[in-house]
């Protein structure tokens, strides 16, 4: 069963909260991407939470979801943001709860800019770079192929880090690749690739968009500190407000926080490769649709 928290009715009464002791450290797993928590950090919003609860919030960066989930399982993280695949997997298999859907879309299948491939059906026999079967990109790729009446056996899969897809496309080592943002935006902004199909076209789940990134928390931490969890979710809505109202400032913050060149982040935001919505509640309908999608993809 996938545990979700609706509008942070945190499954425990606020009155049962255990006050954090002076300078307790809260480890928050993040990735170098367009996650709202990075905006909250760069804008100084986390300082208010630290002062209120007498804690220190430390952002710990991971390149992808699997090691992030391992760290959460080991108790090295109390809360994390990752792709929806790893986030849902954690909520299903670990003592953890999904508390927010913080980014929509993000993923796309790319081909070299000068490729003659114009549809997924033309990928038969193609060499496709992908992040591995444990990634959320894998089921998206499987569905895109199935929708084009192709099977995974009809293509050659090449496992690689998502950050390497643009390089592989540039040197023509692969015919196509599936990855997430900002790696998608990097390939587009640098003129290396173009979008063959995006995640919203493959699997629209929430308001016409794919669910790209989720925030999830260890159950023991949520039970002990529901107010902290509430504030760490609410601050992401505040960060999304900044993104929507002042995208230029948000782009500047992300550039400093994740090290990607400004044109890449600018492309992600202005071309809506990454999409943001103030309603970050993981509704039952959304999660049911997502899990059904994962099960169908195998």
Predicted regions and their residues:
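Pocket-lining segment of extracytoplasmic ligand-binding domains
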Residues: 85-86, 115, 158, 164-256
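Short, surface-exposed acidic
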Residues: 10, 56-58, 152-155, 258-270
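Short, solvent-exposed loop/beta-turn-alpha elements that line the ligand-binding surface or hinge
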Residues: 47-55, 201-208, 274-283
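Secondary-structure end/capping motifs
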Residues: 223-297
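Cleavable N-terminal signal peptides
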Residues: 8-10, 20
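Bacterial N-terminal signal peptides that target proteins for export
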Residues: 1-8
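Sec/Tat signal peptide C-region and signal peptidase I cleavage site
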Residues: 16-22
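Short, glycine-/small- and polar/acidic-enriched structural segments
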Residues: 23-161, 168-171, 175-181, 192, ...
């Amino acid at each position: 069963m996938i545990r979700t928290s609706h509008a942070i009715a945190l499954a425990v009464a606020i009155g049962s909260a255990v006050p954090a002791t002076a300078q307790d450290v809260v480890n928050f797993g993040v990735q170098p991407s367009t996650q709202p928590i990075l905006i909250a950090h760069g804008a100084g919003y986390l300082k208010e939470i630290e002062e209120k609860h007498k804690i220190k919030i430390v952002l710990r960066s991971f390149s992808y979801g699997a090691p992030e989930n391992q760290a959460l399982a080991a108790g090295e993280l109390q809360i994390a943001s990752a792709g929806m695949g790893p986030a849902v997997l954690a909520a299903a298999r670990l003592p953890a709860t999904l508390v927010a859907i913080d980014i929509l879309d993000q993923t796309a299948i790319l081909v070299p800019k000068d490729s003659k491939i114009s549809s997924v059906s033309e990928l038969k026999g193609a060499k496709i770079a992908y992040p591995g079967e444990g990634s959320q990109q894998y089921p998206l790729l499987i569905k895109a192929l199935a929708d084009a009446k192709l099977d995974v056996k009809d293509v050659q899969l090449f496992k690689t880090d998502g950050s390497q897809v643009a390089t592989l496309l540039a040197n023509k080592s692969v015919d196509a690749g599936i990855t997430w943002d900002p790696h998608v935006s990097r390939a587009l902004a640098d003129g290396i690739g173009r979008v063959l199909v995006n995640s919203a076209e493959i699997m629209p789940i929430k308001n016409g968009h794919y669910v790209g990134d989720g925030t999830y928390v260890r159950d023991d931490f949520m039970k002990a500190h529901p107010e902290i969890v509430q504030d760490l979710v609410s601050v992401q809505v505040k960060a999304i407000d900044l993104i929507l109202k002042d995208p230029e400032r948000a782009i500047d913050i992300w550039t400093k926080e994740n090290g990607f060149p400004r044109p890449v982040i600018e492309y992600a935001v202005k071309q809506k490769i990454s999409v943001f919505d103030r309603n970050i509640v993981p509704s039952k309908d959304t999660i049911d649709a997502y899990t059904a999608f994962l099960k169908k993809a195998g």
